[in-house]
Amino acid sequence: MDIMKDKIRQALSELDILATEVQIDQWLDYLKLLEKWNKVYNMTAIKNIDEMLVKHLFDSLAVAKYIKGDSTVDVGTGGGLPGVVLAILYPQHQFTLVDSVGKKIMFLKNVKKSLSLNNINPLNTRIENLEGNFDNIISRAFSSVDTFYELCKHFLTEHNQMLAMKGRDLEERNLESLPLNIEKYSIKVPFLNAERNLIVMRKKL
């Protein structure tokens, strides 16, 4: 476990993120819960906690600096990625975690209770049925960018942003068709030898 903590500290340093030992313990406790539930409920395709550390925890932390304001909705959150990871980092920020799969929301309610994460609100619903105001609308491995936009455009205002976490495929053709201001960022994930990108979309003024 100390080796994993050291790896987290190194990743935080590379990402220029300040975190406490309590937060590091919370991230590890979260991953242990995810690994435990995964054996029964198939929460994620990644089974190994060491692999989860990089492909889930560090991948989620790599977009932390792009989160603005004080509220975020995580669309198709699955096992709570990136929402739970970011909620631990930003305890004053409210995260609404949305998924249509009941067992995943059941898991997230367990995470909320076990880790005393009062700034997450897991909701078992479809995103198109949700109403509310959020500073960030984020998705990771949820859908194509154009589908993400179509399902979430009712949240978009002049003051917030949509963030799509992507791999190598930036879906350039889909992006060109969207009536949005679009910025693309190459994301460096510590200990991961794979291309990761973030697409930030805002309403045209």
From Swiss-Prot:
The keyword Cytoplasm applies. Its main location: cytoplasm. Its EC number is 2.1.1.170. Disulfide bonds: none annotated. GO terms for molecular function: rRNA (guanine-N7-)-methyltransferase activity. It comes from Francisella tularensis subsp. holarctica (strain LVS). This is Ribosomal RNA small subunit methyltransferase G. SUPFAM superfamilies: S-adenosyl-L-methionine-dependent methyltransferases. Specifically methylates the N7 position of guanine in position 527 of 16S rRNA. S-adenosyl-L-methionine binds at G76, L81, I127, E128, R140. GO terms for cellular component: cytosol.
